[in-house]
């Protein structure tokens, strides 16, 4: 019999991967994780995702699989669907999409045909690649028209949305964003969609945890269909879901997901989604969402008081977007400097940005992950001052920038040492 290495620990069998995992744990533990699309999952979510369910192939849906031996994974998928519907108060849900981008594509496939017109937010004003950006499938398969924000306020220009909808007659309108910090008026979007006979897709990838926690407007009752990732403010594994109250749309989406765009679902990830949904149904999750919002508003306030340009002047979500043009520095420069100082964020386009996407004129900060770590208002006040110190130093030359980075790094070390992430060990070497 050929020897099987299935019972060998990763630290023994593959030290290179094990060491990388340990190093990544150390990185997450010792730096402030301020990327708005990231969060820290619980030990229970990690246990589900690292379970034996990864061994099971289960093409199809619960009760209608193409493989035998699926009775137990059916239980898991049904739990995920039931919990998700209960969490958002929707009638139908599909928990199989592997990612948010795929979920959006699956909606397009279900409701549109190539060449149809879609109306979504432009990338530089806060939209996502899948909302019609030229390099993306959504911008290549469809006639993509983009709306933006008011140049003075930074808020979505609903008059422009309506004018574009009336002239372009889109088949689908997308309400959602990846770097828009304010509330989205889903009811107003639906009214416009109804005027032109369009479907309304709400992409709540960034806001879903806040919606579940009652801290952000819900699209349900307005949008025909809703997509979300599960790993941002919802604090679950990397993946996505599609929800609707319309049974006919639900049936089309089922076929679009499988067999349209995916084969076997990732049952270990669906199990982790089910666990995350149960966590989000707990009363404590509302407190978490409230703290995420309070922390981001405190952060925005401190940054503004330190003389930095906060896009829209504040936030209604976990996102804080900084426009760096008045400082004469780029998002790439500042995000790199902040990382050296122990604060991890991402460079980001700001409204009407003229820099290249890999340079940008802004940075995006998020409060979700560090709120999960346990940081509150005092810590986020400190983080705001530390970010401002680095940003201001970036325009003063290499020597002052390096000095600021070193000073801030020492303060970050003190913050993270007081609140290590205890949920993370997933193997002996980690």
Swiss-Prot record:
Cofactor(s) this protein cannot do without: pyridoxal 5'-phosphate
EC class: transferase
CDD domains, per database record: SHMT
Positions of modified residues (N6-(pyridoxal phosphate)lysine): 232
GO cellular component terms, A-Z: cytosol
Pathway linked to the protein: One-carbon metabolism; tetrahydrofolate interconversion; Amino-acid biosynthesis; glycine biosynthesis; glycine from L-serine: step 1/1
Site positions per UniProt: Plays an important role in substrate specificity: 231
Domain of life the protein comes from: Bacteria
GO terms, biological process: glycine biosynthetic process from serine; tetrahydrofolate interconversion
Keyword Transferase: yes
Role noted for this protein: Catalyzes the reversible interconversion of serine and glycine with tetrahydrofolate (THF) serving as the one-carbon carrier. This reaction serves as the major source of one-carbon groups required for the biosynthesis of purines, thymidylate, methionine, and other important biomolecules. Also exhibits THF-independent aldolase activity toward beta-hydroxyamino acids, producing glycine and aldehydes, via a retro-aldol mechanism.
Protein name: Serine hydroxymethyltransferase
């Amino acid at each position: 019999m050929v020897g099987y290495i299935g019972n060998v620990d990763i630290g023994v069998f593959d030290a290179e991967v094990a060491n990388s995992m340990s190093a990544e744990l150390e990185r997450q533990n010792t730096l402030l994780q301020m990327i708005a699309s990231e969060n820290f999952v619980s030990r229970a979510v990690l246990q589900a995702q690292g379970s034996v369910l990864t061994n099971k192939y289960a093409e199809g849906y619960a009760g209608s699989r193409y493989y035998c031996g699926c009775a137990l994974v059916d239980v898991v998928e049904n739990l995920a669907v039931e919990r998700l519907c209960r969490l958002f108060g929707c009638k139908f849900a599909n928990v199989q999409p592997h990612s948010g981008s795929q979920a959006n594509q699956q909606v397009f496939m279900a409701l549109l045909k190539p060449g149809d017109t879609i109306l979504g937010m432009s990338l530089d004003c806060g939209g996502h690649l899948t909302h019609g950006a030229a390099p993306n499938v959504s911008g290549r398969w469809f006639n993509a028209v983009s709306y933006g924000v008011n140049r003075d306020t930074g808020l979505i220009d609903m008059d422009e949305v309506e004018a574009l909808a009336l002239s372009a007659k889109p088949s689908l309108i997308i309400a959602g964003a990846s770097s828009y910090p304010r509330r989205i008026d889903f009811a107003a979007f639906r009214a416009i969609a109804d005027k032109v006979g369009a479907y309304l897709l709400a992409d709540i990838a960034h806001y879903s945890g806040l919606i579940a926690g009652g801290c952000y407007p819900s699209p349900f009752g307005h949008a025909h269909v809703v997509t979300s990732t599960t790993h941002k403010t919802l604090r679950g594994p990397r993946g996505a879901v599609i929800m609707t109250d319309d049974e006919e749309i639900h049936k089309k989406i089922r076929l679009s997901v499988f067999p349209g765009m995916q084969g076997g679902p990732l049952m270990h990830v669906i199990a982790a989604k089910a666990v995350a949904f149960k966590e989000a149904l707990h009363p404590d999750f509302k407190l978490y969402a409230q703290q995420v919002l309070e922390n981001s508003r405190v952060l925005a306030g401190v940054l503004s008081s330190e003389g930095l340009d906060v896009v829209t002047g504040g936030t209604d979500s976990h996102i804080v977007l900084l426009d760096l043009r008045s400082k004469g520095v780029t998002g790439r420069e500042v995000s790199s400097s902040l990382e050296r100082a122990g604060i991890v964020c991402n460079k980001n386009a700001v409204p009407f940005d003229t820099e290249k996407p890999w340079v940008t004129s802004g940075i995006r900060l998020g409060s979700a992950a560090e709120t999960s770590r346990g940081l509150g208002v005092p810590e986020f006040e400190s983080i705001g001052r530390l970010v401002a110190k680095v940003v201001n130093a970036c325009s003063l030359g290499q020597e002052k920038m390096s000095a600021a980075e070193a000073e801030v790094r020492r303060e970050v070390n003190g913050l993270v040492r007081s609140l290590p992430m205890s949920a993370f060990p997933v193997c002996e070497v980690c």
